[in-house]
Amino acid sequence: MMARRDPTSWAKRLVRAQTLQKQRRAPVGPRAPPPDEEDPRLKCKNCGAFGHTARSTRCPMKCWKAALVPATLGKKEGKENLKPWKPRVEANPGPLNKDKGEKEERPRQQDPQRKALLHMFSGKPPEKPLPNGKGSTEPSDYLRVASGPMPVHTTSKRPRLDPVLADRSATEMSGRGSVLASLSPLRKASLSSSSSLGPKERQTGAAADMPQPAVRHQGREPLLVVKPTHSRPEGDCREVPQAASKTHGLLQAARPQAQDKRPAVTSQPCPPAATHSLGLGSNLSFGPGAKRPAQAPIQACLNFPKKPRLGPFQIPESAIQGGELGAPENLQPPPAATELGPSTSPQMGRRTPAQVPSVDRQPPHSRPCLPTAQACTMSHHPAASHDGAQPLRVLFRRLENGRWSSSLLAAPSFHSPEKPGAFLAQSPHVSEKSEAPCVRVPPSVLYEDLQVSSSSEDSDSDLE
């Protein structure tokens, strides 16, 4: 009996075992985990939940089919305000609505009273209301309607002043010229002040303290003469006409002399860029001793040249007394730097002792705008040797600060041989200086010192 088995029963058992294995491998729905797998001390590293590890089949990161979708909780109507605003019943208005209604009723009651008062004072008929029921008057209309005469505003038309007062104001404004000013404002102010004022007004209307610039337009040599009347006498200001050229432009400032002991030096203007083609020259005198400019109109040039030079006919004038600081070093420098051509000899022969020119090599520390140490451009060709005339003698002196000063000494005779002692008789101090004992210096050393002093003057003027 035991040896014989039923083949059908064996086959049935095999089919049942296979079906059970299939069911275990592929579960249809979520199954409850066994109690031994739940351990609250374990934490899954994949999902971060407690009760299972990363190897467990309960982890939703491994079996997405078994993951449960989180169900939404029930709605709580008590905490959510579905109707945030409810209209209040007009029968029972709140306290805020009462105050608001009273404020709206008060201006409506005051409107007819206000309109009646405005009609009485202004005399205008009351305005008709618009058909839509809105009044045309605004709350601020009662401020616009005035009970008295309204002021007349004349902003477009300005009152015309008396021509005398206008000319005086224009003259005063022209006296207060700025440091950097152009040509047109100065010419307009000067022309208006010179043409509109009468003979009586020129005597009484002009300001005594402010100098009046006058522009002359007669002839081919327009000049600008500025006479400061409050700091120096009229005799100190010299008016020497000079030819207008393209190399010399318009208008340099006139600075009044602060120390009357030192002589006046006439400086040449520097050419501005805007007025180069006009060719207007200026003849201005100033005092070199002032450290601060006085309250006088100052007209400075727009473009300062690095090294302004003078022509042979434009030699700066100054007294010889300014060079008496040291002993004479050399009475006859090299002919290339000291001799004048035949064109300049007649002019130098007619000069008086007070008009003997001298060039100061000291840098102008107190004059930042107008450099007074200007070298005299002389002829570098010794043309006086073949004409038979004696060369011009220049006296060079070494100052205390190591700089040089040169002064021109006229020869005994240039073109007037019939009067050989006329000039020496008039200028005895010049002959005394020439006869004084002097120390001979080689021409090359003297020329190098002059070049060093001129370069230092350029650097000082640029720094100032």
From Swiss-Prot:
Biased composition, class Low complexity, residue ranges: 180-197
Region Disordered, residue ranges: 1-42, 70-389, 411-437
UniProt-listed InterPro entries: FAM90 (IPR039213), Znf-CCHC_6 (IPR041670)
Pfam family, one: zf-CCHC_6
Compositional bias ranges of the Basic and acidic residues kind: 74-89, 97-114
Matches recorded under PANTHER family: FAMILY WITH SEQUENCE SIMILARITY 90 MEMBER A11, PSEUDOGENE-RELATED, PROTEIN FAM90A1
Assigned protein family: Belongs to the FAM90 family.
Name of the protein in its database record: Protein FAM90A14
